[in-house]
Amino acid sequence: MSQPAKVLLLYAHPESQDSVANRVLLKPAIQHNNVTVHDLYARYPDFFIDTPYEQALLREHDVIVFQHPLYTYSCPALLKEWLDRVLSRGFASGPGGNQLVGKYWRSVITTGEPESAYRYDALNRYPMSDVLRPFELTAAMCRMHWMPPIIVYWARRHSPQTLASHAKAYGEWLANPVSAGGY
């Protein structure tokens, strides 16, 4: 039996202590030997990112998961800084930038609004696929495989049972992320 893919879970939440949904989602990740949970806000409270260290982590893993809340139609500031610094030209793109070719990218997003708010005729004016397009384009720039995102809409309004169900499905996917496909 082959080993499961090595997963680097980049967790970026500036107020992690207040996010019940994200804490519940992280529980199964911590239990898998093939998953490295890397809390960016815990490691870099001053935003000074150790780029060589982060790039080494990326090289060691097959699947990169970006777990974060949706902040102003994007990611929290530290993750944006991480993307700009770590996925640099010559490492992830451009001449010689082939370090992430063939790896997998998956976004795991929590939102503060219901799924119905993400439509052309609704509050946010665009579907989530459009909102997340910059991440998909970044994955393409790095020549990574874009996996369909996991989105927990209106996360703070879910019952503990519903959050546990999301966490269970997420944990099952993390156990074998490449062959398991979507969740």
From Swiss-Prot:
Record GO terms (molecular function): electron transfer activity; FMN binding; NADH:ubiquinone reductase (non-electrogenic) activity; NADPH dehydrogenase (quinone) activity
Catalysis: reaction(s): a quinone + NADH + H(+) = a quinol + NAD(+); a quinone + NADPH + H(+) = a quinol + NADP(+)
E.C. code: 1.6.5.2
Compartment(s) where it occurs, according to its Swiss-Prot or TrEMBL record: Cell inner membrane
Record-linked Gene3D superfamilies: 3.40.50.360
InterPro entries given in the database record: Flavodoxin_fold, Flavoprotein-like_sf, K_H_efflux_KefG, KefG/KefF
Membrane topology qualifier: Peripheral membrane protein
Main location class: membrane
Group of enzyme by EC: oxidoreductase
GO BP annotation list: positive regulation of potassium ion transmembrane transport; potassium ion transport
Coiled coil: none
Keywords annotated in UniProt: Cell inner membrane, Cell membrane, Membrane, NAD, Oxidoreductase
GO cellular component labels: plasma membrane
PANTHER family linked: GLUTATHIONE-REGULATED POTASSIUM-EFFLUX SYSTEM ANCILLARY PROTEIN KEFG
Function: Regulatory subunit of a potassium efflux system that confers protection against electrophiles. Required for full activity of KefB.
Assigned protein family: Belongs to the NAD(P)H dehydrogenase (quinone) family. KefG subfamily.
Subunit structure of this chain's protein: Interacts with KefB.
Protein's name in the database: Glutathione-regulated potassium-efflux system ancillary protein KefG
